[in-house]
């Protein structure tokens, strides 16, 4: 596990997380726009390519960048808190377990990532609400700032957080799978390389980043499948009236869509999240190398 985590180290880990999440999420905004539209208006869009062509035809190329601002800002903040606190809680829980920390490393990864994600999602939620509203309803506001103002005026502070339960339902399992599968995959790749006469210590930084990239792809695909139903609910609930409460609204959405409907846009999301997660760990571990920080894996 990482050494003692000082405030300075936390800021460095957070900085790496902020850049990795903001850059990768911003790069896949066009894919996310189409995915969101497939979920919120499935009768209009028949697939990913049809979604792209329809958006360009109706809104121009800029339509594929709807919600870019909230995405960049929201995921920078979320990445800072998620990666920073993941390192904090990973060490905290390992210290609490003591000598058997290595034996219980998978539960430690799961618990640390879940705790960090809850903190990060509270910060992400308002930006995600604005992003989804701008994508699903292009005429709702001319800018993210205007959208923030309209949501606050119409629904109050709670309007930004009606998507928090599904965000938690989506992001917590997603992040648990993302970190645990990444750590486990990378660990076993390094073990395999060591068995073939190439211990981790002998690898170049570029080779280590290749391991991060490959492990990130595996982690991203698994995490996308695990969190897909809640992602669909999240896209729907920001269009839903929640007068009867968020839980009731979630129940209505689930009954209306059914099991198959909850997996709308899964191929698109697997491609997007696999690419995104691989990019995140590649950038994050690259920044850690540049800053001389302890790698995420032992």
Curated annotation (Swiss-Prot):
The keyword Transmembrane applies. One of its GO terms (biological process) is phosphate ion transmembrane transport. InterPro entries: Mit_carrier, Mitochondrial_sb/sol_carrier, Mt_carrier_dom_sf, SLC25A3/Pic2/Mir1-like. Keywords: Membrane, Mitochondrion, Mitochondrion inner membrane, Repeat, Transmembrane, Transmembrane helix, Transport. Residues 35-60, 127-162, 230-262 are mitochondrial matrix. Mitochondrial solute carriers shuttle metabolites, nucleotides, and cofactors through the mitochondrial inner membrane. Transports phosphate groups from the cytosol to the mitochondrial matrix. Phosphate is cotransported with H(+). This is Mitochondrial substrate carrier family protein N. The gene is mcfN.
């Amino acid at each position: 596990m990482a050494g003692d985590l000082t405030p300075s180290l936390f800021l460095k880990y957070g900085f790496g997380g902020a850049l990795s999440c903001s850059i990768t999420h911003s790069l896949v905004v066009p894919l996310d726009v189409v995915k969101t539209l497939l979920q919120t208006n499935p009768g209009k869009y028949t697939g990913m390519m049809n979604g792209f062509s329809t958006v360009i035809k109706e809104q121009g190329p800029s339509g594929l960048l709807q919600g870019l601002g909230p995405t960049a800002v929201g995921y920078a903040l979320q990445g800072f808190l998620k990666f920073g606190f993941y390192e904090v809680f990973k060490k905290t829980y390992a210290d609490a377990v003591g000598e058997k920390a290595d034996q219980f490393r998978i539960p430690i990864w799961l618990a640390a990532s879940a705790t960090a994600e809850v903190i990060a999602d509270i910060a992400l939620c308002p930006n995600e609400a604005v992003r989804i509203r701008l994508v699903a309803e292009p005429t709702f506001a001319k800018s993210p700032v205007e959208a923030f103002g309209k949501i606050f005026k119409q629904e109050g502070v709670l309007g930004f957080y009606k998507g928090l339960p599904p965000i938690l339902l989506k992001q917590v399992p997603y992040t648990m799978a993302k970190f645990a599968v990444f750590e486990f995959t990378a660990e076993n790749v390094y073990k395999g390389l060591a068995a073939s006469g190439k211990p981790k210590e002998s690898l170049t930084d570029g080779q280590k980043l290749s391991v991060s990239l490959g492990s990130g792809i595996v982690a991203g695909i698994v995490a996308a499948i695990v969190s897909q139903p809640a992602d669909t609910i999240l896209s729907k609930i920001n269009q839903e009236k929640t007068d009867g409460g968020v839980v009731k609204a979630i129940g209505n959405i689930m009954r209306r869509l059914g099991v198959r409907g909850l997996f709308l846009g899964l191929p698109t999301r697997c491609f997007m999240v696999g690419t995104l997660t691989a990019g995140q760990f590649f950038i994050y571990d690259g920044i850690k190398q540049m800053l001389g920080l302890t790698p995420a894996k032992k």
